[in-house]
Amino acid sequence: MSLSKLAKQIHTEEGPKWWVDLETGLPKDRNPGEMLMLIVSEVAEAMEGVRKNLMDDKLPHRKAEEVELADAVIRIIDYCEGRNLDIAGAVEEKMAYNRNRADHTREARLATNGKKF
Protein backbone atom coordinates (compact mmCIF):
# COMPACT_ATOMS: atom_id res chain seq x y z
CA MET A 1 0.00 0.00 0.00
CA SER A 2 1.33 3.44 -0.87
CA LEU A 3 1.98 5.97 1.87
CA SER A 4 -0.75 8.20 0.43
CA LYS A 5 -3.32 5.39 0.59
CA LEU A 6 -2.16 4.41 4.08
CA ALA A 7 -2.52 8.04 5.18
CA LYS A 8 -6.11 8.17 3.91
CA GLN A 9 -6.96 4.86 5.63
CA ILE A 10 -5.39 5.91 8.94
CA HIS A 11 -7.14 9.27 8.93
CA THR A 12 -10.47 7.63 8.06
CA GLU A 13 -10.12 5.24 11.01
CA GLU A 14 -8.32 7.47 13.54
CA GLY A 15 -9.64 10.87 12.51
CA PRO A 16 -13.04 10.56 14.17
CA LYS A 17 -11.27 9.86 17.49
CA TRP A 18 -9.03 12.93 17.38
CA TRP A 19 -10.48 15.46 14.94
CA VAL A 20 -14.17 15.39 15.88
CA ASP A 21 -15.77 16.72 19.06
CA LEU A 22 -17.20 13.62 20.73
CA GLU A 23 -20.16 15.53 22.21
CA THR A 24 -21.25 17.53 19.15
CA GLY A 25 -19.87 15.46 16.27
CA LEU A 26 -18.49 18.67 14.76
CA PRO A 27 -14.92 19.08 13.51
CA LYS A 28 -12.54 19.86 16.33
CA ASP A 29 -9.76 22.45 16.09
CA ARG A 30 -6.75 20.57 17.50
CA ASN A 31 -3.72 22.18 19.09
CA PRO A 32 -0.73 21.25 16.87
CA GLY A 33 1.70 21.48 19.81
CA GLU A 34 -0.37 19.06 21.87
CA MET A 35 -0.60 16.62 18.98
CA LEU A 36 3.13 16.78 18.26
CA MET A 37 3.87 16.08 21.92
CA LEU A 38 1.59 13.02 21.75
CA ILE A 39 3.88 11.77 18.97
CA VAL A 40 6.90 12.47 21.18
CA SER A 41 5.27 10.49 24.01
CA GLU A 42 4.90 7.44 21.74
CA VAL A 43 8.60 7.65 20.84
CA ALA A 44 9.44 7.96 24.56
CA GLU A 45 7.38 4.84 25.25
CA ALA A 46 9.33 3.03 22.50
CA MET A 47 12.56 4.08 24.21
CA GLU A 48 11.28 2.70 27.51
CA GLY A 49 10.53 -0.57 25.73
CA VAL A 50 14.10 -0.70 24.42
CA ARG A 51 15.60 0.29 27.77
CA LYS A 52 13.72 -2.43 29.64
CA ASN A 53 13.54 -4.96 26.77
CA LEU A 54 9.76 -5.11 27.15
CA MET A 55 7.14 -6.92 25.17
CA ASP A 56 3.99 -4.92 24.46
CA ASP A 57 1.17 -5.27 26.98
CA LYS A 58 -1.64 -5.11 24.36
CA LEU A 59 0.07 -7.14 21.61
CA PRO A 60 2.24 -9.45 23.76
CA HIS A 61 3.74 -11.25 20.76
CA ARG A 62 5.40 -7.95 19.70
CA LYS A 63 8.12 -5.86 21.27
CA ALA A 64 6.92 -2.68 22.97
CA GLU A 65 9.43 -0.77 20.82
CA GLU A 66 7.72 -1.96 17.65
CA VAL A 67 4.17 -1.24 18.81
CA GLU A 68 4.96 2.20 20.23
CA LEU A 69 6.73 3.18 17.01
CA ALA A 70 3.65 1.98 15.10
CA ASP A 71 1.58 4.28 17.33
CA ALA A 72 3.96 7.15 16.53
CA VAL A 73 3.66 6.49 12.78
CA ILE A 74 -0.13 6.36 13.04
CA ARG A 75 -0.18 9.65 14.96
CA ILE A 76 2.24 11.31 12.53
CA ILE A 77 0.26 10.26 9.48
CA ASP A 78 -3.08 11.20 11.05
CA TYR A 79 -1.64 14.58 12.10
CA CYS A 80 -0.45 15.25 8.56
CA GLU A 81 -3.76 14.25 7.00
CA GLY A 82 -5.73 16.32 9.50
CA ARG A 83 -3.59 19.38 8.74
CA ASN A 84 -3.56 18.76 4.96
CA LEU A 85 0.18 18.11 4.86
CA ASP A 86 1.52 16.07 1.93
CA ILE A 87 3.61 13.67 4.01
CA ALA A 88 4.07 11.18 1.15
CA GLY A 89 5.43 13.88 -1.14
CA ALA A 90 7.62 15.31 1.61
CA VAL A 91 9.07 11.86 2.41
CA GLU A 92 9.89 11.25 -1.26
CA GLU A 93 11.56 14.66 -1.62
CA LYS A 94 13.47 14.32 1.65
CA MET A 95 14.77 10.86 0.69
CA ALA A 96 15.93 12.21 -2.68
CA TYR A 97 17.66 15.12 -0.95
CA ASN A 98 19.32 12.83 1.61
CA ARG A 99 20.75 10.59 -1.13
CA ASN A 100 23.10 13.40 -2.12
CA ARG A 101 23.71 15.08 1.23
CA ALA A 102 27.38 15.76 1.75
CA ASP A 103 27.13 15.32 5.52
CA HIS A 104 25.60 11.85 5.08
CA THR A 105 28.63 10.39 3.29
CA ARG A 106 30.93 7.91 4.98
CA GLU A 107 33.84 10.32 4.67
CA ALA A 108 31.94 13.19 6.26
CA ARG A 109 30.82 11.04 9.17
CA LEU A 110 34.35 9.78 9.80
CA ALA A 111 35.81 13.30 9.67
CA THR A 112 36.69 15.25 12.81
CA ASN A 113 33.41 16.68 14.15
CA GLY A 114 31.45 14.60 11.63
CA LYS A 115 28.01 13.28 12.51
CA LYS A 116 28.44 10.30 14.79
CA PHE A 117 24.77 9.36 14.96
Stretches found by the model and what they are:
Residues M1-F117:
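Flexible "arm" and connector segments at domain edges
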